[in-house]
Amino acid sequence: MAMAAAASPSKILIPPHRASAVTAAASTSCDSLRLLCAPRGRPGPRGLVARPVPRRPFFFSPRAVSDSKSSQTCLDPDASTSVLGIILGGGAGTRLYPLTKKRAKPAVPLGANYRLIDIPVSNCLNSNISKIYVLTQFNSASLNRHLSRAYGSNIGGYKNEGFVEVLAAQQSPDNPDWFQGTADAVRQYLWLFEEHNVMEYLILAGDHLYRMDYEKFIQAHRETDADITVAALPMDEERATAFGLMKIDEEGRIIEFAEKPKGEQLKAMMVDTTILGLEDARAKEMPYIASMGIYVISKHVMLQLLREQFPGANDFGSEVIPGATSTGMRVQAYLYDGYWEDIGTIEAFYNANLGITKKPIPDFSFYDRSAPIYTQPRHLPPSKVLDADVTDSVIGEGCVIKNCKIHHSVVGLRSCISEGAIIEDTLLMGADYYETEADKKLLAEKGGIPIGIGKNSHIKRAIIDKNARIGDNVMIINVDNVQEAARETDGYFIKSGIVTVIKDALLPSGTVI
């Protein structure tokens, strides 16, 4: 098996179904739920037939449309046979440059051991969705390599038919253009997606950080008899102005959209979020809901929207979903009240990574046994820490850390940090390979600098991309408090006051930034 949780390479990929779905003790309750979830007229368990569901559904509880941890999930048909996951690789990632100079956004390293793409793929696998496509276009080489190494062999699922496959943008006689947007990317591969005998398509982004049970999301879609279900994040007034907001009716049906509203337009988008399951006190703090860019779309609806109703639409969020609402389709909101971060900018990426070091509870935890995050098994040795002072930090596999100080930082794979170095509030991405002793000796003879952090260097509030060579006595502390600077020829950029050293860059000894 070519995939593993970083902390436990031997773990089974597809976690077993929840005991409630397979044990005799819970069979009666699950049969009841299956009848509710089954499509109209479809035979349920034990020969029973589900009653036709009216277009205006009866809500058994507001929790039916929220990500409640206490709710029970019994999908029929099972997600492994009835849902196709489609992960969008994203655009050129210009706001994340220079991290996207040589890689696609979803391939950007995350949390010492992982890459961004591991998040949606792991969420799918943990939700029993094992048929997954990843659509890519820009700088796809490292993303393709990671996916093939991490998820290339059989990954289980129904009759061991699971897969994670990369679909690259391509030109054809019928369509000479590259992907023009999220909807266009899906449209160009509809011929392939249509071949799968599934009920729904699950549309996901490849650059979000969150942990979500998609089975509950899909169950809500079926229970409400929706054509489209949109994952929604509760928002307070301060954050709401930066997002696309949605307004819902008393049944949780989306009736209006507004992109980054302000003033009176913002107030007009207030909703009663208790409809979606929030407690009264929290609902008062969070009176807005924002789209997460995550959708469950019934198969026949997707084909109709992209081929017939909106054949020229390029984007789901700004064109297809509002268009479907305007034509009278049932577009439901599904509340996700957990940590979620769109890794769209250098600042957001930096904060998301350092957030995993937060005490006592990190913003996002990679240590959840019930829903692990999988990645490529690299078979690296344990990290070696020699006479170092390390506090409030996360250290990846295979690092060599000598007599230095590391505080509130994330240290990536194969990082080498020399004596006397000080690393504070920093993300080190590490290296793709080790240099041999012979390599280092040859470099020293030529006056070169090995991969890693040199002696007595001081790095604060920075991102050091992979394979960077930082010499001795280097200061990366933004001494002039510069907020924006593009010094690519010198090996670094500054965005939002954060210094980002480019992949494979070389900073000579004594450099001061």
UniProtKB/Swiss-Prot annotation:
Pfam families: LbH_GLGC (PF25247), NTP_transferase (PF00483). Pathway: Glycan biosynthesis; starch biosynthesis. Residues 1-64 form a transit peptide. CDD domains: ADP_Glucose_PP, LbH_G1P_AT_C. It is found in: Plastid, Chloroplast; Plastid, Amyloplast. InterPro entries: ADP-Glc_PPase, ADP_Glu_pyroP_CS, NTP_transferase_dom, Nucleotide-diphossugar_trans, Trimer_LpxA-like_sf. One of its GO terms (cellular component) is amyloplast. Keywords: Allosteric enzyme, Amyloplast, ATP-binding, Chloroplast, Nucleotide-binding, Nucleotidyltransferase, Plastid, Starch biosynthesis, Transferase, Transit peptide. Leaves and starchy endosperm. Its EC number is 2.7.7.27. Activated by 3'phosphoglycerate, inhibited by orthophosphate. Allosteric regulation. It catalyses: alpha-D-glucose 1-phosphate + ATP + H(+) = ADP-alpha-D-glucose + diphosphate. Disulfide bonds: none annotated. GO terms for molecular function: ATP binding; glucose-1-phosphate adenylyltransferase activity. Belongs to the bacterial/plant glucose-1-phosphate adenylyltransferase family. This protein plays a role in synthesis of starch. It catalyzes the synthesis of the activated glycosyl donor, ADP-glucose from Glc-1-P and ATP. Heterotetramer. This is Glucose-1-phosphate adenylyltransferase small subunit, chloroplastic/amyloplastic. It comes from Hordeum vulgare.
